[in-house]
Design a protein with these regions (language model features):
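Conserved N-terminal entry element of GNAT/NAT acetyltransferase domains
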Residues: 1-24, 185-186
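Active-site rim helix/loop that mediates acceptor-substrate recognition in acyltransferases
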Residues: 47-67
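Conserved beta-strand in the GNAT
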Residues: 69, 75-85
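Conserved acetyl-CoA-binding loop-helix of GNAT-fold acetyltransferases
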Residues: 114-130, 152
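Conserved GNAT acetyl-CoA-binding A-motif
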Residues: 131-143
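Conserved active-site alpha-helix within GNAT-family acetyltransferase domains
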Residues: 145-163
Length: 188
């Protein structure tokens, strides 16, 4: 429980941090985020407070994933689901390596959706994934193919397109960041 990552980003003059989601204290905010039309379009997970609490509780007890809340200056703005790619549904769609990490994400607070903020949190969460498990060499995302706002930010943060493929519920684009490339070419 608690905070797992914190660093100051001088480009935006903000403190970025990630903490484990709490199904009690984060429930109302998480429910509001999941019921936001823009978030619901990509996540397809709108529902009542009870539905969202149950979802967060499942994530907290999962053996292959865990939920994080992203904060700027200690104000929550986003939700990240960190998972082991080999144990997730994405593992059937590429040649995974042991310790590959995956990421699902949403930005729930509109004032933090600007391009300059995206580079901060996207590089920050990638940095966290690589620091959290030193054996992790690659991080993967599989956003919906029509999430153009996100795609334009991925390459500057070190992600490259691997392929497009279909899940039962969506057409996705797999993107991947490599540890060596991130630390030598991209950075924070």
């Amino acid at each position: 429980q608690g905070e797992v990552y914190r660093r100051y980003d001088p480009r935006i003059r903000r403190m970025l941090s990630f903490r484990i989601a709490d199904p009690v204290s984060d429930a109302e905010r998480f429910t509001r985020w999941m019921n936001d039309p823009r978030v619901e379009y990509f996540w397809e997970q709108s529902g009542s407070l009870e539905v969202q609490i149950a979802y967060l509780e499942r994530q907290l007890t999962s053996k292959h994933a865990f939920p994080l809340i992203g904060c700027f200056d200690d104000r929550p703005f986003s939700y990240f689901e960190i998972y082991w790619a080999a144990e997730d549904r994405i593992g059937r769609h590429y040649s995974w390596q042991p310790f590959d990490r995956g990421l699902h994400l949403l930005v729930g607070e509109t004032q933090w959706r600007g391009a300059h903020y995206v580079q901060s949190w996207l590089r920050g969460v990638t940095h966290y994934l690589l620091l959290n498990e030193p054996r992790t060499q690659r991080t993967v995302l599989e956003p919906r193919i029509d999430n153009q706002r996100l795609f334009r930010h991925l390459e500057p943060a070190g992600y490259r397109t691997i392929k497009e493929f279909d899940f039962p519920h969506k057409r996705s684009r797999m993107v991947m960041a490599d540890r060596h490339h991130f630390f030598t070419e991209v950075g924070l």
